[in-house]
Amino acid sequence: CAVLISMLLKEAEYDFYAVFSVQEEIGLRGAKAAAYTAAPDAAIVLEGTTAADIAGVEFSRRVCALGGGPAVSFMDRATVYDKAYYNAALKSGITCQPKAAVAGGNNSGAVHTSRGGVRTLAISVPCRYIHSPASVADKCDIENALRLAEYMLKGICSGEIE
């Protein structure tokens, strides 16, 4: 939410829809309705994701780590992300990390299959203790998620990222 609110507080070069959706955990209901109504040409889904970079968790089960920048997914349980967007994000020069697991999912699962299909990228802020009353995130990861979202929005809207 903080990344999207920060984007809305700035004057953007391009028009875009911002959606704060509900009921992601019980069927992506808000995202389904929003994607169908807005009928986007492209989508950048912003979210928090499980970092699991804590003591007692095997390294192979750590999806991403705090301080490594936002995580960018190539695939998850519900979505195969746009390859050009994924590669552009990783080559942007903005600190980010590939998400190391294809488990789980997010609102992209509803957005990318809406209507005739929507090219989609997910930018995920690594969080410890996600879905608890208090999650922990690295402020630099949030700032880099904002920078990456703005970079991708500009690149997609201008046609620089195809």
Task: State where each predicted segment sits.
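Alpha-helical metal-binding/catalytic segments enriched in His/Glu/Asp
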Residues: 1-27, 148-152
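Active-site-adjacent substrate-binding region
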Residues: 65-146, 152-160
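Alpha-helix C-terminal capping segments
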Residues: 6-12, 36-39, 112-117
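Active-site loop ensemble at the mouth of alpha/beta enzyme cores that anchors a bound cofactor
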Residues: 40, 55-72
